[in-house]
């Protein structure tokens, strides 16, 4: 879901 994608992006960056 949206929240999950944002969390992954924050972990990558």
Curated annotation (Swiss-Prot):
UniProt keyword Secreted present: yes
Tissue localization of expression: Expressed by the skin glands.
GO cellular component terms, A-Z: extracellular region
Descriptive protein name: Grammistin Pp 2a
Protein's GO biological process: defense response to bacterium; killing of cells of another organism
Keywords: Antibiotic, Antimicrobial, Cytolysis, Hemolysis, Secreted
Subcellular location: Secreted
């Amino acid at each position: 879901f949206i929240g999950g994608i944002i969390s992954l992006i924050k972990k990558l960056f």
